[in-house]
Amino acid sequence: MHATETSLPLVSIIMPAFNGEPYIGAAIRSVLAQSYARWELLILDDGSADRTAEIAEAFEKSDPRIRLFRNPKNLGAAQTRNRGFALAQGEWIALLDCDDIWHTDKLEKQLALASRGDILYCSYALIDESGKHLSDFLVPESTDYEAMLRESVLSCSTVLLRRSILAGQRFPTEYYHEDYVFWLELLKAGYRAIACTEVLADYRLVKGSRSSDKRNAAKNRWLIYR
């Protein structure tokens, strides 16, 4: 696919970035390698103390689809993603953490299911800090509110959201596992979640960071919401 095919829906990719110097380059390159080329990448640096913003800026200069924004202070992942929602122009919104990687056909294969759902997700691989494959997390073809209470299968770097469902919906900032609460809110509102069950993303487990808790994020914390 080519970026000139303007009849295709635009995908806004929101990438929060905080001290991601070792990994952000690989994350951005995985977006550039997508077979589906009609996207914009919004990188939001959240007060990094390393070269994260510098690396992102170099990519911004090389491709007009990439834009870098700097938070005036450290806001945290939830508020940073919410800022990205406000900046996004696409019909679909994707999320990609700066230490994760997409497979080249991720957007194309998920968007092939766009007519069936409002939330599109996929299976993913777990990798370590060096990129070594650890295991696969295979997801069911669909999920709903009750199913998500039993098992969390939606993960930020796998999800595409129809922009129209986000009116008034934002990541809550009062919970530690705000992403899980956010998915529950969308599903409880009746939005349809459909999966491409193929492994289309790599989730990197980084020691000492919240990313090491990705796969089981708040699986049993639904009580705070229910």
Language model regions located:
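Cell-envelope/extracellular polymer assembly enzymes that use nucleotide-activated donors
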Residues: P9-S12, S30, E40, V181
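A conserved hydrophobic helix/loop-capping motif in glycosyltransferases and polysaccharide synthases
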Residues: V11-Y23, A27, Q34, L44
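Acidic helix N-cap motif at the loop->helix transition within catalytic regions
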Residues: P22-G25, D50-A58, I101, D105
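A conserved acidic beta->alpha catalytic loop
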Residues: S30, A37, D45-E54, K73, ...
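Glycine-rich, basic loop-to-helix element that forms the pyrophosphate-binding segment
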Residues: N71-A88
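Conserved nucleotide-sugar donor-binding catalytic segment
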Residues: A86, L138-N216
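Short aromatic/hydrophobic "clamp" motif used to bind/position activated sugar donors
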Residues: I93
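Conserved donor NDP-sugar-binding/catalytic core segment of glycosyltransferases
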Residues: D105-L134
